[in-house]
Amino acid sequence: MTATPESLFPTGDELDSSQLQMESDEVDTLKEGEDPADRMHPFLAIYELQSLKVHPLVFAPGVPVTAQVVGTERYTSGSKVGTCTLYSVRLTHGDFSWTTKKKYRHFQELHRDLLRHKVLMSLLPLARFAVAYSPARDAGNREMPSLPRAGPEGSTRHAASKQKYLENYLNRLLTMSFYRNYHAMTEFLEVSQLSFIPDLGRKGLEGMIRKRSGGHRVPGLTCCGRDQVCYRWSKRWLVVKDSFLLYMCLETGAISFVQLFDPGFEVQVGKRSTEARHGVRIDTSHRSLILKCSSYRQARWWAQEITELAQGPGRDFLQLHRHDSYAPPRPGTLARWFVNGAGYFAAVADAILRAQEEIFITDWWLSPEVYLKRPAHSDDWRLDIMLKRKAEEGVRVSILLFKEVELALGINSGYSKRALMLLHPNIKVMRHPDQVTLWAHHEKLLVVDQVVAFLGGLDLAYGRWDDLHYRLTDLGDSSESAASQPPTPRPDSPATPDLSHNQFFWLGKDYSNLITKDWVQLDRPFEDFIDRETTPRMPWRDVGVVVHGLPARDLARHFIQRWNFTKTTKAKYKTPTYPYLLPKSTSTANQLPFTLPGGQCTTVQVLRSVDRWSAGTLENSILNAYLHTIRESQHFLYIENQFFISCSDGRTVLNKVGDEIVDRILKAHKQGWCYRVYVLLPLLPGFEGDISTGGGNSIQAILHFTYRTLCRGEYSILHRLKAAMGTAWRDYISICGLRTHGELGGHPVSELIYIHSKVLIADDRTVIIGSANINDRSLLGKRDSELAVLIEDTETEPSLMNGAEYQAGRFALSLRKHCFGVILGANTRPDLDLRDPICDDFFQLWQDMAESNANIYEQIFRCLPSNATRSLRTLREYVAVEPLATVSPPLARSELTQVQGHLVHFPLKFLEDESLLPPLGSKEGMIPLEVWT
């Protein structure tokens, strides 16, 4: 190759533009009436970043960039302009505006770089053609403008003229895409591919920096503890937005780290705090990031700008809020509740179809082949197929799964990850944690485009789908013959059955009874693992919620925090294959591209339980919200939960939910107020075991701590109430479960309805819905990770409370009335008035119905658990007697017509004469007690 003559390359001191003629160039124009925001880069651009040296498309096409030199700063009197003056340049691009400060020499360096770029491009044949014949809307020649010569600072008028010269110089350059998109220009303007994405908020602060390695406040990520002594400096491009900062690799453009602002946020300048000359230190709860600037003045400027940005729309995340939550209450939020999986899954499916950018999912267990709308007649509503279709459309799907201890749990998250990752490159799945731990990621969350979020007790997994019918059988039609079998996979496609004539609601592993048999062989999803001809399924009752707007942003931020935390802490996820995620700005949260029907206007606050092992920070705002809501309730509490392990003794059990309930009832009793507490629990814990022989060690361990909370021992709720008021406790609290019946094999069958809900309703005005059980695992924060929302009504409607007129919240009232209606069988009793939950007549009806139903079920099925079996000996005698359902099915059917709804009393005397703690020699007995509580 012929050497380039050195004379073609300017030294940077020459500012003569005579050899910089341009034939023509495009002129940025917008159509009349066109909004510049419509041309800005889409949010998905964050996943397609390029090297900062390859001239990526930074500016929105057709949207002009304008500059204005708005002032100067002199910081050394008597010096020359080129060394003592900073020019403040105000730039505008559409709705974005920002200020950069430059010395005169920065203009000189830019001028030199653009000259070199012009000369180099003219030497390349194809590039020369592109320069000479670039499209134009005007025929006028354009040339590289000249810089004013540097000289001594003169009068104010002279300084103003220099500002105008620089302003005109820059504006002429910015009309030419040949120079405007060159990396030297974008670096000078402090812009990147992340600058003009509306959902990321305002432009923010950007620039080239040197950052120091380390500083992570995560065990194992620092070389020598917190005060790291072995580190390296790396050159990166820093981007600061209103609630986070990030830095990018210059060579690839990939995001190398994201630091979310939180209550630990602090910015410091100086060698004492940074151990670096011209250093800036940015602290959050997760990391202490140290940057090195070119001068102390630049360090002060950057620190000031970062602090001001953090005080903008993202300032909510710089402090803890009510209940010590990371998120504040968000008024004006559209929220909709779901009872049972049918409605929840269908709404999730509809939201997935509307996704345009991102889908976030985190679950304790996720079954890729679960159907979201049923009965399924094709694969259109199968979760993995839906995610694959959206990924093919360009939507980015990020999934976080709990990585279980395989010897203890059979949810096979490894299979779920492999099955999903093979579908499309846009689907990314991470599992956490790697280390063996006693605790779990128990939260359930799905977020679409960071504007709509689902959460509650429902995993997108087998066994969760149900409706208000709580069917015990699924034989596909009215026939109960053995010939009625669910569809089996086609020979040519072993993973997918033929569904063209399907009438089944639960296919393969979805037909389940978790006490009869736990799930096995999950990699064979369409094969039954229990005999549906002889074994009834166990109905699944659960509650979920969907929220829009700002709370969805808060929930997305939680997911992003966990995702980025996992990526940072696990070596296998540090590759660019797993991208860092970025939270959208709260400033655009109310621009909803879609909403789900049925939402009601409420105030919503996101709550969570997290610890350093799970998310890098500690929070137990769910517990705080439970305690506060119970303490401040005036009329009643309605609690549905999978577990109820509480009443602190300061040693084994630490949460005080049960204690607050006792205190609130005692206060009402002392003051003579009408106050009710309704508690609904599953009649048995959801572990595999033969209850006819006592249920197995796992079932008995949970029963032990449940009864310890409810009625056994000095710390229990009923023991403390009886000590204070005798039998009057029955006027204040009701503890029940749910049961149903059906037909299978020609005779009646019964099964408990497994309550998996995690919901609290107070006074028909306040609701807590989430994934958190009432136990230490879910509530302390240091154990399982959980999510919940506190929903407060802002719209009311007339109702009743203890016979008096009462303004009830629409969200809470509608949810409570729906729950009561299904539980009490209101569909067969149109005269049942559910408005007043605490009057004597209603409370007595509730208690009588629970007692009557329990007696009928015991008489017909001799079902367990039962108050008649207070020891293992009486249990053996009890199950030895043939039930009426087997001896005389016709008589049993006749008696069952008297059952109303599903409500039954919780058997408080079941095995009360036995010690239910696991034997010390058993594997369950060797597990720490904290696992059960």
Curated annotation (Swiss-Prot):
Q: Into which EC class is this enzyme placed?
A: hydrolase
Provide the PLD phosphodiesterase domain boundaries.
Answer: 437-464, 751-778
Q: Where is the PX domain?
A: 65-195
Recorded hits in InterPro entries, A to Z, give:
PH-like_dom_sf, PH_domain, PLD-like_dom, PLipase_D/transphosphatidylase, PLipase_D_euk, PLipase_D_fam, PX_dom, PX_dom_sf
Q: Where is this region: Catalytic?
A: 441-788
One Pfam family linked to the record = PX
Q: Where found, per UniProt?
A: Cell membrane
How is it modified post-translationally? Phosphorylated by FGR.
Q: Which reaction does it catalyse?
A: a 1,2-diacyl-sn-glycero-3-phosphocholine + H2O = a 1,2-diacyl-sn-glycero-3-phosphate + choline + H(+); 1,2-dihexadecanoyl-sn-glycero-3-phosphocholine + H2O = 1,2-dihexadecanoyl-sn-glycero-3-phosphate + choline + H(+)
How its function is modulated: the record gives: Stimulated by phosphatidylinositol 4,5-bisphosphate and slightly activated by the ADP-ribosylation factor-1 (ARF-1).
Q: Name a GO CC annotation attached to this entry.
A: brush border membrane
State the oligomer form and interacting partners.
Interacts with PIP5K1B. Interacts with EGFR.
Q: What is this protein identified as?
A: Phospholipase D2
The protein's organism comes out as Homo sapiens
Q: Corresponding gene?
A: PLD2
